[in-house]
């Protein structure tokens, strides 16, 4: 059994444009100094927001990785050298940049907006030989199902339109009512959870917004909450079938 918990204070930090964009990074770059390093086929995970006015990160290149942006609040605008135009995205929307053999993009985060940017490793020995592609998906494209105690939004999984090449990835977002909860965990997989709002009582400790959980070799994730909360989940293989970039270093 393995449950690792990383509060905001244990995560790497970042910023752009003199603090116009701020970040906590559950999984940072090697030079960022956070406690958690890349694992599974997850290479990077940043929670970024604008505390005030909108701000733009200028054109910059990417290769190999699949870069997914999830709009948690507000709006963003995206530009890349394949689309050659600005594309707006709103709360609940998702974009996928399969950066392949190279693409450059710019991103504008609107005032008081918030995103995840997560890099997946699709097997760089293959992806670096492929052309870059782009897709975005609207919030209404994703299925929301009710269950006892809340709802689950399937972002990547059965019946989801979202597609990535990185193997065996599932992504969900839970909206949970107050009470006791138990989430079934998959054998051979790593479940990564991020508290989007509210608090969790786990093993007699309280964890709040921004806390990150990495869990594997456990049948169920059991916890209590006093009131409504939101929980973001990525399920990924404990041992990918290929050597990841992080394992090559």
Regions found by a protein language model. Give the residues of each.
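Conserved, well-structured core segments that form or line functional sites
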Residues: 103, 112-205, 209-211
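"Short basic amphipathic alpha-helical interaction patches in structured regions
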Residues: 82-90, 109-110, 130-136
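Short acidic-glycine-tyrosine-enriched beta hairpin
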Residues: 80-98, 186, 201-225
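Glycine- and charge-enriched low-complexity intrinsically disordered segments
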Residues: 129-133, 244-249
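Conserved short histidine dyad/triad with adjacent acidic residue
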Residues: 4-34, 42-62, 72-79, 86-87, ...
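Ligand-binding loop in jelly-roll beta-barrel domains
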Residues: 99-126, 206-208, 215-246
């Amino acid at each position: 059994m393995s449950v690792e918990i990383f509060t905001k204070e244990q995560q790497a930090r970042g910023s752009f444009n003199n603090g116009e964009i701020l970040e906590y990074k559950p999984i940072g770059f090697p030079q960022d100094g956070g406690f958690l390093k890349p694992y599974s086929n997850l290479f990077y995970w940043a929670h970024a927001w604008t505390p005030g006015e909108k701000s733009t990160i200028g054109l910059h290149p990417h290769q190999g990785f699949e870069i997914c942006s999830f709009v948690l609040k507000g709006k963003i605008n995206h530009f890349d050298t394949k689309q050659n135009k600005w594309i707006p995205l709103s709360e609940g929307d998702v974009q996928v940049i399969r950066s392949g053999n190279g693409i450059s993009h710019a991103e504008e985060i609107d005032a008081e907006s918030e995103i995840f940017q997560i890099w997946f490793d699709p097997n760089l020995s293959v992806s670096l030989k492929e052309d870059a592609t782009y897709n975005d998906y609207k919030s209404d494209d994703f299925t929301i199902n009710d269950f006892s105690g809340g709802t689950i939004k399937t972002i990547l999984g059965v019946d989801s339109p979202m597609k990535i090449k990185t193997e065996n990835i599932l992504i969900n977002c839970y909206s949970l009512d107050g009470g006791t909860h138990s989430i079934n965990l998959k054998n051979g997989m790593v479940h990564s959870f991020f508290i989007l709002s509210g608090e969790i009582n786990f093993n007699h400790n309280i964890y709040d917004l921004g806390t990150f959980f990495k869990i594997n070799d456990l049948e169920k994730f059991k916890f209590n909450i006093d009131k409504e909360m939101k929980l973001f989940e990525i399920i990924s293989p404990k041992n990918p079938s290929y050597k990841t970039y992080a394992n090559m270093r």
